[in-house]
């Protein structure tokens, strides 16, 4: 049993290869999927060379196909630096990477870094909305969360998680995640990279700011007030050895001092819960720090800056 997902599993390997080839063959016409080698291989003795073999089996099975698919590898819970990545793997997925250090540690790979499972942090929508925005604006490429609003009794996703479930989920959260999707797709995000030095000063104590930018052209800025170790809706540290991630709901106002190349820009503050435009201003940058005052907000807010 301990060698099921190793290259020492005897005749089982041929069955696994045949299964992979069958799946790849059946799905070859679909362009809305990628293949992940194995979920959470770090639990249960899944050998790295077996994972590489499965990736190579997918590549070989698709070699004659007109439409080829990306291959993902699930690396770790949390964040770690990837050593010796396999060339067939295009997406490196992490679970519970909050804060999103997995992106920073592996940015140099020039590959997609994903957060493809998060949960176990209570059921508040704000927690998973903030984790999603934080990861994507840090430069991440994939986000999804455990969603316990879908059950046998509520296949439409309207169940209200009762606290016994290790995560949240709701129609409201999914609407909020669409705001993130629409926000990031409003950019040529492939041309953007993390540029947190754009913010010269102004980030409040206890807040986090992310900047994704195509310098001189497009800037996506995100500010939030969430972190592990705080009781929900308070600033009281939790004694829990794996403290829940939670978001302060206190009223906030932020003035960022941003350094932009000389030119004319438009800055738009956006409500991450509704997508509503809260404030717009035009500015002319001299290349020195320029003050951008947010409207009042709670939990988090996004700022879109684009050259005019």
Give the positions of each predicted feature.
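Active-site mouth of glycoside hydrolases
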Residues: 1-89, 100
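Short strand-edge motifs at loop-to-beta-strand transitions and within beta-strands
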Residues: 288-290
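Hydrophobic faces of well-ordered beta-strands that scaffold small-molecule active sites
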Residues: 35-37, 71-73, 92-94, 113-116, ...
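Glycine-enriched alpha-helix->loop->beta-strand junction motifs that scaffold or abut catalytic
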Residues: 85-92, 108-114, 136-143
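Aromatic- and carboxylate-lined catalytic core of secreted/periplasmic carbohydrate-active enzymes
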Residues: 128-281, 293-308
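Active-site clefts of carbohydrate-active enzymes
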Residues: 41-43, 75-79, 89, 100-131, ...
């Amino acid at each position: 049993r301990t060698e099921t997902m190793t290259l020492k599993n005897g005749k089982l390997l041929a069955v696994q290869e045949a299964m992979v080839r069958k799946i790849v063959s059946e799905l070859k016409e679909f362009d809305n999927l990628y293949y992940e080698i194995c979920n959470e291989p770090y639990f249960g003795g899944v050998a790295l060379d077996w994972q590489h073999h499965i990736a190579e089996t997918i590549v070989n099975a698709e070699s004659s196909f007109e439409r080829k698919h990306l291959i993902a590898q699930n690396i770790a819970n949390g964040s770690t630096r990837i050593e010796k990545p396999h060339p067939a793997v295009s997406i490196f997925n992490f679970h519970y990477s909050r804060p999103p250090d997995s992106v920073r540690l592996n940015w140099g790979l020039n590959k997609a870094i994903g957060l493809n499972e998060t949960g176990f942090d209570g059921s508040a929508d704000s927690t998973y909305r903030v984790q999603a925005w934080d990861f994507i604006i840090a430069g991440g490429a994939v986000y999804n969360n455990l969603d316990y609003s879908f059950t046998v009794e509520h296949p439409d996703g309207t169940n209200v998680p009762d606290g016994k479930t290790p995560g949240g989920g709701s129609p409201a959260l999914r609407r909020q995640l669409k705001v993130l999707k629409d926000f990031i797709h409003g950019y040529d995000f492939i041309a953007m990279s993390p540029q947190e030095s754009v913010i010269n000063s102004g980030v409040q104590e206890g807040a986090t700011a992310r900047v994704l930018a195509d310098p001189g052209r497009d800037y996506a800025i995100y500010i939030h007030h969430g972190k592990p170790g705080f009781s929900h809706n308070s600033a009281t540290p939790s004694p829990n050895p794996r403290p829940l991630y939670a978001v302060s709901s206190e009223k906030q106002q932020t003035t960022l001092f941003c350094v932009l190349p000389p030119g004319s820009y438009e800055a738009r503050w956006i409500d991450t819960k509704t997508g509503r435009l809260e404030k717009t201003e035009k500015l002319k940058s001299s290349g020195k720090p320029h003050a951008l005052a947010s409207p009042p907000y709670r939990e988090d807010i996004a700022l879109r800056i684009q050259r005019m």
